[in-house]
């Protein structure tokens, strides 16, 4: 699956996708990314598309650390995806890791809207978390 960075001409589509998720989070909205950008964060809006519509997405925030020590990478209240669709989740997470690594992220924090369970813990460990 191909993961693309979403440009501003798809802002409404991004917000509609985020708003219709079972666990909508303001922190995955376009405006939240704009706010964080003003606070010195670099914003990447990454999405998996199928048949010209977003099926999984993550607003990845990157903040440089002082002294050129790398950066931190953070996806507040996301990624947003159907975690049972393993191929989709794997593709999105691979691109997230690639972008974070490109910014020399010393860690990547995600906050997927999942209930804490041994099944979800096992799944996330299997995906590299």
Positions of the model-derived regions?
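Conserved donor-binding loop and adjoining core beta-sheet/short helix segment
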Residues: 33-113
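Short amphipathic alpha-helix that is part of the acyltransferase structural core
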Residues: 1-30
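Flexible, glycine-rich phosphate/dinucleotide-binding loops
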Residues: 12, 67, 117
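Generic secondary-structure boundary/loop-capping signal
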Residues: 23-24, 32, 77, 126
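Internal, well-ordered alpha/beta segment that forms a basic, Gly-enriched binding/recognition surface
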Residues: 108-129
């Amino acid at each position: 699956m191909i993961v693309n960075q979403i440009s501003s001409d798809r802002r409404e589509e991004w917000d509609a996708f985020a708003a219709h998720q079972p666990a909508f989070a303001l922190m995955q909205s376009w405006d939240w990314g704009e706010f964080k950008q003003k606070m010195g964060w670099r914003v990447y809006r990454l999405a998996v598309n199928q048949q010209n519509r977003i099926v999984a997405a993550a607003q990845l925030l990157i903040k440089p650390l002082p002294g050129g020590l790398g950066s931190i990478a953070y996806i507040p209240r996301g990624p947003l995806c159907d975690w049972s669709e393993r191929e989709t989740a794997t593709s999105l997470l691979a691109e997230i890791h690639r972008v974070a690594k490109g910014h020399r992220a010393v860690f990547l924090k995600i906050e997927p809207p999942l209930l804490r369970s041994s099944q979800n813990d096992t799944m996330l460990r299997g995906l590299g978390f």
